[in-house]
Amino acid sequence: MAILYHYPMSPYSEKLRAAMGFSGISWQSVVVPEQPPRALLDGLIGGYRRIPVLQMGAQFYCDTRLAFEALHDGDGGAFQLDSGDEAFREWAESEIFFAVFSACSSLQVLRFLHSQVGLADAIRFVRDRMGMMKNATITPLGRKSAAIQIHRYVADLELRLASGCFLAGDSPGYLDFCCYHPLWMICHLDKAASSRWPHLVTEWVARMRALSNNEVATASPEAILESISGDDTKPLETVEAPFRRGDRVSVAPSDYARDETIGELVVLNRERIVLSRGLDSGQLIYVHFPREGFDLV
């Protein structure tokens, strides 16, 4: 059983919610606070703060690409893209993702946050995100530049959607889920945004949004521990030099939200880093990170 640690207004969570809805994957929900501390999740995976996190038994995936692969039984082909599509995905999930927030006014952002979490938590959220970006290695675009980038992005989407209902063709694929969630976020921040988009794009967004409208049960703390206990998989693979299996290391994103997770190194290869962490219950869990975009010390 998949367990998703998420919160309603998280764009990357929406990416996985839509993917699981389309695939008909049964999953359970753990709704976490919009910003740390998150007592339950922190106790499992340490300092890593990005959301969502996907749990499959004793395996915890701290990246939506790794999570997508795990949901498809390790089938790497499920998210393989050609070079042109991969470049478009990278643009969507990096520059466009951040442009979404830069293109909106502060009033729009605060109004949305207030509607979701109330005034006090909205203020805490903004302060948290400002602190999160202090040691970031990325530079957000100005509002005008961000709006121009989003306009270009929507225009490119229209061209790509001219030949099918989805970017992948007749049914959604990995590229659809990656490119959808930035526009999903824009629609929440700016209610009038979609009225300015071509109908091919608005209809595609509506089709994608419908995929995540599935009811799920809440995972109890007991169910979480039971899921861990029922998984005896130990991902003991290659550890590339100069590191050795069992080294106590820290892993953190290299661009933003650079809080670290500490554990024992069990996998280090070209694609991923996996740490083992012991819980107070005596159980072991395995926390998976992508190799690209993360620092290992």
What feature does the model see in each segment?
Residues M1-R124, P140, F243, P253, ...:
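GST-like domain detector, emphasizing the conserved glutathione-binding G-site
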Residues M1-Y12, A206-E222:
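N-terminal short leaders/motifs
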Residues G43-L44, L167, V239:
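Short, flexible, glycine/charge-rich loop motifs used to bind or transfer phosphoryl groups or to couple energy/partner
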Residues A92-A206, A210:
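GST-like fold's C-terminal all-alpha helical module
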Residues A193, I224, G278-L279:
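Sparse recognition of residues in long alpha-helices and their boundaries
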Residues N213-R245:
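Mixed-charge, Lys/Arg-rich low-complexity intrinsically disordered regions
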